[in-house]
């Protein structure tokens, strides 16, 4: 019997996962963003890259930045939306100098500001790196055109770089590129600065256009509302005139009805007339006009022609002494009726009225409403009392 192959019983070798290839996008859960601090970039990425320690995730691409223009770099990155990270070598500008070469394809990078030291967190606050800001200019120095592309360059300090970076060997017939190498790796962040002034002007322009459109859209509504308001004011004024006219009509109708009735019932009819006048709505406006005959005059002269004439009431006699003057009222008092022959006398039911401001009270009791100057001039003559002053001879 042939011996069995010893290798047949051995377990197959385990498959090792291949290392992440350069340029492949990292597999991160949704919602994660790569936005490290300056210290994290230097300590956890640049130092490990310079020491040739493998990184857990290939999230920063190796690109020689100075062989491309900045607007070509975002498509070279494996990760990033508004800012992109790269590992890039640095070369010398001159073989025996220490200045880096900042020239690019169609322009150059110019340093701005001062270098910012990067300190490690902890008690010692050790300096672990340096941060430099650069701006890209189109054209050739020193007359290049400034752009909005910004670079933040992170490099290790001298103590760290002496142990982790490759210094160029002395020139002994080697290649020229090896003699110009200043640093094997620096870490760079690239982004494009947004012009806030232009963005603000654009925002204000859009808001202005929206305001104009809103105003144009709302103008017909305002015009319609204005016309409606004007119509409302006109209708209110018409209703005010109608209210005033109806009040005058009601009052005059009451006077005419009382005149047709003949005032046969005496005080009872007058009381009904006064009550009807008071029941009518008050006028909207009252105009006061001074008069020499009476202090209060409020009605038009048109009502004078329809005032009922006073009737004769025999037996009326009333007198009052005020100081040296004797005021008397008799039933046989003649009244001027404007040229007529009728004789008007004071009715006896007026005895219970006080004598103060007799004309004013008589107007309100008889008419139920105030009179205008022309009306009171005619009405007052009907109630004028003779005045007798002792010691004065009235006969010529």
Swiss-Prot record:
Protein name: NAC transcription factor NAM-B2
InterPro entries, per the entry: NAC-dom, NAC_dom_sf
Cellular localisation: Nucleus
Cellular component, GO annotation: nucleus
Domain NAC: 28-193
Bias (Low complexity): 1-13
Keywords, alphabetical: DNA-binding, Nucleus, Transcription, Transcription regulation
Gene assigned in the entry: NAM-B2
């Amino acid at each position: 019997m042939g011996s069995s192959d010893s290798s047949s019983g051995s377990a197959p070798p385990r498959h090792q996962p291949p290392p992440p290839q350069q340029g492949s996008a990292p597999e991160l859960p949704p919602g994660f963003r790569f936005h490290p601090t300056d210290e994290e970039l230097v300590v956890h990425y640049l130092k490990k890259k310079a020491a040739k320690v493998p990184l857990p995730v290939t999230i920063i691409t190796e690109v020689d930045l100075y062989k491309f223009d900045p607007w070509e770099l975002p498509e070279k990155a494996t990760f990033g939306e508004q800012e992109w990270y790269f590992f890039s070598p640095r070369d010398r500008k001159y073989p025996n100098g220490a200045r880096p070469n900042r020239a690019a394809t169609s322009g150059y990078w110019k340093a701005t500001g001062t270098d910012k030291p990067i300190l490690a967190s902890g008690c010692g606050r050790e300096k672990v790196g340096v941060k430099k800001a650069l701006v890209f200019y189109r054209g050739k120095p020193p007359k290049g055109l400034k752009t909005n592309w910004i670079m933040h360059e992170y490099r290790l300090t001298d103590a760290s770089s002496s142990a982790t970076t490759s210094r160029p060997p002395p020139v002994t017939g080697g290649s020229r590129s090896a003699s110009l190498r200043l640093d094997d790796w620096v870490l760079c962040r690239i982004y494009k600065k947004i012009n806030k002034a232009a963005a603000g002007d654009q925002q204000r322009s859009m808001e202005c256009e929206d305001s104009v459109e809103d105003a144009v859209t709302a103008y017909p509504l305002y015009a319609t509302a204005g016309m409606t308001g004007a119509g409302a004011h006109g209708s209110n004024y018409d209703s005010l005139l109608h209210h005033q006219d109806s009040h005058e009509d009601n009052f005059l109708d009451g006077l005419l009805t009382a005149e047709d009735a003949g005032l046969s019932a005496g005080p009872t009819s007058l009381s009904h007339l006064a009550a009807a006048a008071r029941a009518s709505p008050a006028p909207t406006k009252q105009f006061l006009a001074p008069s020499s005959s009476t202090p209060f005059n409020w009605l038009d002269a048109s009502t004078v022609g329809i005032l009922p004439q006073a009737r004769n009431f025999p037996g009326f006699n009333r007198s009052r002494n005020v100081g040296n003057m004797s005021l008397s009222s008799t039933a046989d008092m003649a009244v001027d009726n404007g040229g007529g022959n009728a004789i008007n006398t004071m009715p006896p039911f007026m005895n219970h009225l006080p004598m103060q401001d007799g004309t004013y009270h008589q107007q309100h009791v008889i008419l139920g409403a105030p009179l205008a100057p022309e009306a009171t001039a005619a009405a007052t003559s009907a109630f004028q009392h003779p005045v007798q002053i002792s010691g004065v001879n009235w006969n010529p």
